[in-house]
Regions:
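Hydrophobic, well-ordered beta-alpha structural blocks that scaffold small-molecule cofactor pockets
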Residues: 1-43, 50, 163-221
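ADP-ribose/adenylate-binding Rossmann-like module
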Residues: 74-80, 85-113, 234-261
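Conserved SAM/SAH-binding loop
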Residues: 61-66, 222-225, 238
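An accessory alpha-helical subdomain
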Residues: 129-180, 188-191, 267, 277-387
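Short loop/edge segments at beta-strand edges and connector loops
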Residues: 41, 59-63, 105, 221, ...
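Short acidic/histidine-rich motifs immediately flanking catalytic phosphotransfer sites
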Residues: 55, 70-74, 227-233
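Short beta-strand and adjoining strand-loop segment in the mid-core
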Residues: 36-38, 73-81, 123-131, 270-282
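Short, conserved SAM-binding/catalytic segment
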Residues: 47-57
Length: 387
């Protein structure tokens, strides 16, 4: 399970290395969160080219070079070379000490993972399956968009950007959270030390969540106000004397002043849905709480976590047996929509009916009847591996 958080990226220097749609998505998400976005790539997509032409993104028209990651707050590696991506991770995280590094599709070379997000008029909602099923994540995102359609502004990947006088300006300025949409992520905290400074109910909640995420939690005394160099994340309810905006710190007394904050959450095993208001006000947080309660009824203790565990258990076999990302993606789509008779139909995931009893993969898994589908899955893996 990844630790859910929203980053405060206003004016932070962020670097994306790579081309293609993945790099485009990374760059646009960071831009919409207020970042000072830099891109290194010998080629760019049409949409990125438009942003560069309007001075929204700083572009370096070349391949990655040693030393490129120096001075950045966050680095995303999205090249088509595994070796290059590994070089980027080692330089950024291990040599330069950058805490926020993401290598696309390589969890061991990530300190965080980006999550899907739905931006509503009053709140933003992040969805993470902790990397176990992008297909499930997408369907939940689409369901949430549909459920709150009268309030939906647009999904990050579809929304157009706003230009003003050819300068970097807030995108969708009506969504003011430091003038930007917050950047949703999941911290990979397993076996990483996280320091807690102070004692209150919020911090106790953070401790419990961190432990669920596999973090090593260190409790500090109230008067320990200086940075712990061994800490990946720091949570404090007191004034943090050495905080300069570069460390990963949540200040629970004033979340908007830290580098990140923990949203309201709905959790079922590795399914984590985060809800945060787009305005920092009492009424906005109350509305976010209402959304949290609604989504908890829909998603907590309904079998989604077990379903993700099942799909995640298939990934090692699928990764070694099915040769291309496109085929692997389609395999999981087919499995999700499979019923017990081997027929393909669109699975509702109980979104519209909590009492749904269709003999689909989802219902068979959550009622512990996986033996009925394992043979079908094995045959499908063989089919995809040969085609």
């Amino acid at each position: 399970m990844f630790y859910p958080a929203f980053l405060n990226l206003q004016d932070k220097k962020c670097l994306v290395i790579g081309a293609g749609t993945v790099a485009e998505r990374k760059a646009i998400s960071l831009l919409r969160s207020g970042s000072d976005v830099h891109l290194i790539s010998p080629r760019v997509t049409e949409r990125l080219h438009d942003l560069i032409q309007h001075n929204q993104i700083s572009w370096f028209d070349r391949q990655f070079q040693d030393g490129d990651t120096s001075g950045f707050f966050l680095v995303c590696a999205a090249t088509d070379s595994t070796q290059t991506n590994t070089r980027i991770f080692k330089e950024a995280h291990k040599k330069n000490g950058i805490d926020l590094v993401n290598v696309v599709d390589v969890v061991p070379e990530c300190t965080f993972a980006a999550t899907s997000i739905v931006v509503l008029e009053k709140v933003s909602i992040s969805i993470s399956t902790s990397g176990k099923s992008p297909a499930v994540c997408r369907r939940i995102r689409e369901y949430i968009e549909s459920k709150f359609c009268q309030d939906t502004i647009n999904h990050l990947e579809k929304e157009s950007l706003v230009y003003k006088d050819d300068k970097k300006t807030p995108v969708r300025e009506e969504h003011t959270f430091k003038s930007k949409v917050p950047y949703p992520i999941g911290f990979l905290t397993a076996d990483r030390q996280c320091t807690i400074i102070g004692k209150n109910n919020k911090l106790l909640e953070r401790v419990n969540l961190l432990r669920k995420c596999g973090a090593k939690v260190k409790m500090a005394d109230d008067d320990t106000l200086r940075r712990d160099p061994s800490a990946f994340l720091t949570f404090a309810d007191v004034e943090y004397q050495e905080y300069n905006g570069s460390q990963l710190v949540e200040l629970t007394r004033n979340p908007m002043q830290g580098t990140f904050y923990t949203p309201l959450i709905t959790v079922d095993h590795d399914l984590v849905i985060g809800i945060t208001p787009n305005l920092d006000s009492k009424s906005a947080w109350q509305y976010a709480k209402q959304i949290q309660t609604d989504l908890a009824t829909q998603f907590e203790s309904q079998g989604y976590g077990h379903f993700l565990d099942f799909l995640g258990s298939l990934r090692p076999k699928v990764m070694t047996s099915i040769p291309t990302p496109a085929k692997r993606k389609q395999f999981f789509e087919d499995i999700i929509d499979q019923n017990s008779k081997g027929e393909k139909e669109l699975c509702c995931f109980d979104f519209g009916d909590l009492g749904c009893s269709n003999e689909c993969t989802f219902n068979l898994v959550r009622t512990h009847r996986t033996d009925q589908i394992k043979k079908t899955i094995q045959k499908k893996i063989q089919t995809y591996s040969y085609n």
